[in-house]
Regions:
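Alpha-helical transmembrane segments of multi-pass membrane transport proteins
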Residues: 1-298
């Protein structure tokens, strides 16, 4: 009963919608065109292939909200190219900003647990998400410079305009979500549903790459991703309930107050260290239902 009631939330309805829209981007040819556009913009720079990977991840993350989906869609295409020209394998796997940039599954679950507004969470996430993306681009540039990785060619304005025309409809998809949520036209859940319908229209009518077989793949892929996220979350809520019944939360809060002598900075540092330690072994989706009820009231 606790397993089912843990995911019985309207807020969490946003997750499958964003998963479906991300899967539509992948199967409908939208992600491929976004990579081509980013490539025309950045591939001429030192470290251009890495920068393209980061930029495409940021755009894809603004639709799917899932790091796994972003790696499957973008990393599958860009990672082999990065390795081929000299990037190390471990470096190529570190460019996903999808969990940070809204609509993030992590933010949706955080809001569901704490009762905070998802819209406000998303608005707060855009600036750090963009900042981290820009920092990763700079790192890619200096990494390529240090390891003497070649340039990707010259900048051609015609190629940028041509690729922009190709991916215009694809770029509108994240814009619909961002503008719809930030302007208050729709809730995040409604924005996800609108993105699904729009992506389906673009994939079938505009790019003509979505057929019945691919739509089946979209639904199965989204169901698999959603099932993984929500199963982890549901199991963690049961674990959190046991913690509450046994009074572990009160004991943990008392311990924090005693160790920190009531200092807010020390409490924050202890919580950060605790979350960092647990995050080395567990997914954020599994950590939050256990940790947030303990530390959020503080």
């Amino acid at each position: 009963r606790g397993f089912i009631s843990g995911v019985n939330s309207f807020t969490l309805m946003a997750i499958p919608f964003f998963m479906i829209s991300g899967s539509i981007m992948n199967q409908g040819g939208l992600s491929k065109r976004i990579i081509q556009f980013c490539s025309s913009l950045f591939s001429w720079l030192r470290g251009g292939v890495g920068i393209v990977c980061v930029a495409a991840n940021m755009i894809f993350g603004a639709v799917s909200g899932s790091g796994t989906a972003a790696v499957a869609a973008i990393g599958f295409i860009t990672a082999p190219d990065m390795e081929k020209i000299g990037y190390k394998k471990e470096f190529t796997g570190a460019a996903s900003t999808a969990p940070i940039i809204p609509p993030s599954n992590v933010m949706i679950i955080f809001a569901s647990i704490t009762g905070l507004s998802i819209t406000r969470m998303f608005l707060a996430g855009y600036t750090p998400g963009l900042a981290i993306g820009l920092i990763l681009m700079v790192i890619c540039h200096f990494y390529a410079k240090k390891h003497n990785i070649d340039y990707g060619g010259k900048f051609h304005l015609k190629a940028v305009i041509s690729s922009l025309g190709e991916c215009f409809w694809a770029l509108l998809m994240p814009l619909i979500i961002i503008v719809g949520i930030t302007a208050g036209f729709c809730t995040p859940t409604e924005a996800g549903a609108i993105a699904c319908v729009y992506g389906l229209f673009v994939g079938v009518v505009c790019y003509k790459e979505l057929n019945f077989a691919k739509i089946k793949k979209v639904l199965f892929s989204a169901a698999e991703g959603t099932g993984q996220v929500l199963s982890l979350y549901a199991a963690s809520t049961v674990f959190a309930y046991i913690f509450t019944v046994e009074g572990f939360g009160v004991k943990f809060q008392e311990w924090l107050m005693n160790v920190s002598s009531g200092s807010a900075i020390v409490i924050e540092l202890l919580i950060a260290a605790f979350v960092l330690l647990i995050g080395c072994f567990m997914e954020p989706v599994a950590v939050m239902p256990v940790i947030l009820p303990l530390v959020f009231p503080l």
